[in-house]
Amino acid sequence: MASFYVNGQLVTAEKNQKLLRFLRDELRLTSVKDGCSEGACGTCHVLIDGKATKACVPSVDKLEGRHIITVEGLSDTEKEVYAWAFAKVGAVQCGFCIPGMVISAKALLDVNPDPSREEAAFAIRNNICRCTGYKKIIDAILLAAETFRNGGRIPQESDRARVGEAMPRIDAKEKVLGTGKYPDDIYLDGMIYGSAVRSRYPRARVLAIHKEKALALPGVVGVYTADDIPGKVKVGHLMQDWDTMIPVGKITHYLGDAICLVAAETPEILEKAKKLVEVEYEPLKPVFSPTYAAQPFAPQVHESGNLLCEKHVSRGNADQAIRDADYVLMYHYETPYTEHAFLEPECAVAYRDEDGVTILSTDQGTYDTARETSIMLGLPKEKVHVTNMLVGGGFGGKEDMTVQHHAALIAYLSGRPVKVKLTRSESILVHPKRHPMKVTITMGCNNDGLIQGVKAEVTADTGAYASLGGPVLERACTHAAGPYHYDNFEITGRAYYTNNPPAGAFRGFGVTQTCYAMEMTLTKMAHELGISPWEIRYRNAIRPGQTLPNGQIAPPSTGLVETLEAVKDICENNKNMGIACAMKNAGVGVGIPDTGRCIVAVHGGKLHIRSGASCIGQGLGTVLTQIVGTMLHCDREDIVYEAANNVDAPDSGTTSGSRQTLVTGEACRRACQKLLEAAGADVKVSDYTGIANIAELRDLPGENCGDGAVGTELPETVQVDWKKLEGQEFYGEYLAKTDPLGAQDVANPVSHVAYGYATQVCILNDDGTIKEIDAAHFVGKAINPLNCEGQIEGGVAMALGFTLTEHYPLYDCIPSAKYGTLGLFRADKVPTINSILVEKKGQDMACGAIGIGEITTIPTAPAVAGAYFALDGEMRCSLPLMKTPYERPKMPRYWW
């Protein structure tokens, strides 16, 4: 027993436990987040006697008489200032790390009210953020400091919601103050706790599961095996090959496989019960690499074989073009597994309802979760109700189910509400990673530096299950040729199953790996030709009206050249410089139906936005709010963005592929057009394009809403009385039509409805440390410039880790990483990142916007590697890069 003060109140802890658990589970102070419980991430920071301390470290019996402050205990003035400052500068994305950042900021400002930028960065060095790149968090701390020095007075802010303006995010305040709810913040009456007993071996036959001892433990609600599943055992995002649990007699595929599920009244009883479950195995030799998987004598990971898929894309005659070229280069490249390391571990709460089961989730696709769970439960998908809570980061790692179906199954079988949450070590083990890839690329150029032909072979380790391995490989291949204009290329890719952890979606979606190979080879080619790396890219850059290597004609909105021109002076004025270009699709494309859907409803005198699209920190709710505000000339206070769900919000697909701003943004715009028409405005919605014909209200006929580079905003004098439409709903839908990969009957296929383009430059100091990254990104129309900058800064910081420091070591298919050993960049190590937004009109959908969530990570690695090539002349062809000041001792390499 220990007594101490929490937010000024004397409290007594009856049992000894970590302070984090006491604050959350007993006092319900949920601003204190559980990101790792390993003392590594900083999301649980509190003040103990004025010092920022990770609450997962001290036990309560060591805190007698101490004073603890959480965000809930800040003064009203402090709360208002921090909430305003973090929102004002765009420092909030997923938000999971932010309360901990606020505590570290307060610890600094209480002793140093006027810190420097370096001092602010040092103060949050023990707080990890995977979304922002830290720049805007430091901006927020400095703005808060200035505001406190001026008496805490906050200036009056505009309530406008307009496209093109840096409107603060609609969910910023609740995330800063910790009042918003992530699934782990939910505590229901009668709630039990569930978890999986996982495989002891990456590959083994399960001979028997003995659960009697666990069931005999008081407080255990149930132990469930594959035999208890009412529907199908196997689920999967695209391919149903992922076992909900491994049945007795079957073979495990990786260490993260669930053998059985245990449910108990408390987390403590749950952990004891899991240890009492006895599983008999027959260990088998695992498949540890794609090279081994491809051998005819290798064990079969799945009955279908070890080859998940093969992709082949070509145009022209690459072999002949390379033979005829004046210069030919061939290089081999390797990239490793990397971990998403989002701050919020996977968590779901589920309960039975009168119509089926409800899941309160943190994932990237509510409808996908409902569909897969319904297959497992043997229920119609309409009886599985999924609502997305706040999502503490995803980056692709929350596309596949991890805990949602397990929670639903326990709730369905037990009849009790249940919370299933992965520990950080489980999260690192279970969810899919970035694909390791091996790329061999051959490039031919003429004497003028024009690319004549490119060939590439790509090999990927997709791990234990398919996940998104097929589409990732496809995207890696279709983008391997780069954003350049030439007619001859041939790319072959193969993805193999192994008994390693699965690989799936990760920001960049396969393009990050092949772009590294293509761009580094192009940098070397420029060196061989005696021209600058900027010049060779400018000569080859795709321009409007030209054909991309895949045959798609570049539309007028194509903006690669403009991104190159934006960094020309930077390149010319710095010697230790590397540069890389990239393109990335927005939307699924390649012939797959890709639909955005949105409802704008008038309810209670407000405009309600409803869409099944998940907001995972990228700011979709803010984007849709600005589109509605622009179209209907209303302010933020008039608009309510509802949480994504599959009950009363239409299916708008998974949040991936940089698609939601484009497809759901366009659907939202169309819904607004229908509302305008119903209100009596002179608006006609074309069934073919969905573009509003409001010529008399536009400077440019057929252009969309928004000001500046893309069009003109609806005049403020044009008003409609939308409140008279109370009770009505307006449905918008946009179908992005594209041609299938390898379509033979289409001369110029449309692989994707839109592409983003980028050029990034890395400048080194003479000692090899990075001085700055300059990132020029074509965004079409920046619906929210702050959001765009935040995506760029966060994407670059994440990519710097991928390039220089991050690794996910495996030994015989067994990972050994902890959160603190992943090599994530921290605030005091991230270099200056300068965002350059390139706007250009011509793209019709979604007010001219193109999503940039993924492309921000893609060109960083080759830009950095190119800078080191400029520094010492050495080609670095594997990641993370070796022989840099950032290299970590004894960093293991992926074993091919």
Predicted regions: what is each one?
Residues A145-L307, V328, L413:
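Flexible, low-hydrophobicity surface segments
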Residues P296-L377, N540-K606, G690, P740-V750, ...:
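Helix-loop-helix junctions that connect adjacent transmembrane helices in secondary transporters/permeases
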Residues A226-D227, G378-K383, L413-V418, N447, ...:
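C-terminal catalytic domains of large/alpha subunits in multi-subunit enzymes
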Residues Y281-L284, T369, N388-L390, F395-P483, ...:
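Conserved beta-strand/loop scaffold segments within soluble protein domains that form the structured core
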